[in-house]
């Protein structure tokens, strides 16, 4: 593990109890009886509330459904992993040699969980307001333009609304292949419409590849 003081500097928060920070950085593969899963559980709840309250005030005229989509676009593994990478969090996480050799320090799930655990740890030590301040600073730094149109990239829904309205057809998404090692698995998805391939995309998850394919299709249709 690197010097955790560097991580504290990036967080702009110095832990009084260094063991609490180390606890938040301990993956279950390193020590089953002493890992960050409980702190992750707490941090997840804190972040859910922090982001929910933030969006409630920032998008004062938006309906509940739109706010829920916005929160889902921010409170997820991919977004939290991005923030974790900005902190070089993988360098500080304690994990087994086997997990590290399997790409553990780059896994979005592990990075995201560690970030949540750190926020949970700050909440335990300093209270909600401290955790809120730090969480919002990290979110705004990594997502400087928090805009509904940018965050809610639900291209699949938009495409389906267009195709159903114009030709009464629903796009179908077929998995062409899955390839790569387990920790870097890639999926190739073909978007089919009325029996013809309209677009194709590759991404690290089926859902992401489907969204990318839908975006390509929308661009072809001139709907973006």
Curated annotation (Swiss-Prot):
<dbReference type="GO" id="GO:0006397">
    <property type="term" value="P:mRNA processing"/>
</dbReference>
<comment type="similarity">
    <text>Belongs to the ribonuclease III family.</text>
</comment>
<dbReference type="GO" id="GO:0006364">
    <property type="term" value="P:rRNA processing"/>
</dbReference>
<feature type="domain" description="DRBM">
    <location>
        <begin position="154"/>
        <end position="223"/>
    </location>
</feature>
<keyword id="KW-0963">Cytoplasm</keyword>
<dbReference type="InterPro" id="IPR011907">
    <property type="entry name" value="RNase_III"/>
</dbReference>
<dbReference type="InterPro" id="IPR036389">
    <property type="entry name" value="RNase_III_sf"/>
</dbReference>
<comment type="function">
    <text>CRISPR (clustered regularly interspaced short palindromic repeat) is an adaptive immune system that provides protection against mobile genetic elements (viruses, transposable elements and conjugative plasmids). CRISPR clusters contain spacers, sequences complementary to antecedent mobile elements, and target invading nucleic acids. CRISPR clusters are transcribed and processed into CRISPR RNA (crRNA). In this organism endogenous ribonuclease 3 and Cas9 are required for correct coprocessing of pre-crRNA and the trans-encoded small RNA (tracrRNA).</text>
</comment>
<dbReference type="GO" id="GO:0019843">
    <property type="term" value="F:rRNA binding"/>
</dbReference>
<feature type="domain" description="RNase III">
    <location>
        <begin position="4"/>
        <end position="127"/>
    </location>
</feature>
<dbReference type="GO" id="GO:0010468">
    <property type="term" value="P:regulation of gene expression"/>
</dbReference>
<dbReference type="GO" id="GO:0008033">
    <property type="term" value="P:tRNA processing"/>
</dbReference>
<dbReference type="GO" id="GO:0004525">
    <property type="term" value="F:ribonuclease III activity"/>
</dbReference>
<keyword id="KW-0255">Endonuclease</keyword>
<comment type="function">
    <text>Digests double-stranded RNA. Involved in the processing of primary rRNA transcript to yield the immediate precursors to the large and small rRNAs (23S and 16S). Also processes some mRNAs, and tRNAs when they are encoded in the rRNA operon.</text>
</comment>
<dbReference type="Pfam" id="PF00035">
    <property type="entry name" value="dsrm"/>
</dbReference>
<protein>
    <recommendedName>
        <fullName>Ribonuclease 3</fullName>
        <ecNumber>3.1.26.3</ecNumber>
    </recommendedName>
</protein>
<dbReference type="GO" id="GO:0003725">
    <property type="term" value="F:double-stranded RNA binding"/>
</dbReference>
<feature type="active site">
    <location>
        <position position="116"/>
    </location>
</feature>
<keyword id="KW-0540">Nuclease</keyword>
<keyword id="KW-0479">Metal-binding</keyword>
<keyword id="KW-0507">mRNA processing</keyword>
<keyword id="KW-0694">RNA-binding</keyword>
<keyword id="KW-0460">Magnesium</keyword>
<feature type="binding site">
    <location>
        <position position="116"/>
    </location>
    <ligand>
        <name>Mg(2+)</name>
    </ligand>
</feature>
<dbReference type="Pfam" id="PF14622">
    <property type="entry name" value="Ribonucleas_3_3"/>
</dbReference>
<feature type="binding site">
    <location>
        <position position="113"/>
    </location>
    <ligand>
        <name>Mg(2+)</name>
    </ligand>
</feature>
<keyword id="KW-0699">rRNA-binding</keyword>
<keyword id="KW-0819">tRNA processing</keyword>
<feature type="binding site">
    <location>
        <position position="40"/>
    </location>
    <ligand>
        <name>Mg(2+)</name>
    </ligand>
</feature>
<keyword id="KW-0698">rRNA processing</keyword>
<dbReference type="InterPro" id="IPR000999">
    <property type="entry name" value="RNase_III_dom"/>
</dbReference>
<keyword id="KW-0378">Hydrolase</keyword>
<feature type="active site">
    <location>
        <position position="44"/>
    </location>
</feature>
<dbReference type="GO" id="GO:0046872">
    <property type="term" value="F:metal ion binding"/>
</dbReference>
<dbReference type="InterPro" id="IPR014720">
    <property type="entry name" value="dsRBD_dom"/>
</dbReference>
<dbReference type="GO" id="GO:0005737">
    <property type="term" value="C:cytoplasm"/>
</dbReference>
<comment type="subunit">
    <text>Homodimer.</text>
</comment>
């Amino acid at each position: 593990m690197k010097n955790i003081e560097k991580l504290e500097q990036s967080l702009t928060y110095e832990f009084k109890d260094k063991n609490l920070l180390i606890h938040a950085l301990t993956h279950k593969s390193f020590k089953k009886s002493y890992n960050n899963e409980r702190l992750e559980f707490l941090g997840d709840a804190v972040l859910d509330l922090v982001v929910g309250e933030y969006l409630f005030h920032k998008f004062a005229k938006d309906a509940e459904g739109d706010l829920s989509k916005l929160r889902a676009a921010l409170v997820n593994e991919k977004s939290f992993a991005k923030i974790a990478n900005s902190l070089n969090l993988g360098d500080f996480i304690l994990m087994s040699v086997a997990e590290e050799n399997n790409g553990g320090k780059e896994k979005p799930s592990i990075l995201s969980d560690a970030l949540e655990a750190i926020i949970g740890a700050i909440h335990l030590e300093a209270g909600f307001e401290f955790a809120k301040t730090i969480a919002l600073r990290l979110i705004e730094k990594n997502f400087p333009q928090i805009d509904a149109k940018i965050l809610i990239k639900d291209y699949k829904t938009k495409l389906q609304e267009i195709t159903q309205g114009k030709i009464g057809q629903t796009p179908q998404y077929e998995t062409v292949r899955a390839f790569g090692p387990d920790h870097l698995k890639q999926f190739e998805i073909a978007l089919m419409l009325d029996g013809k391939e309209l677009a194709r995309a590759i991404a690290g998850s089926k859902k992401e590849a489907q969204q990318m394919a839908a975006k390509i299709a929308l661009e072809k249709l001139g709907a973006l």
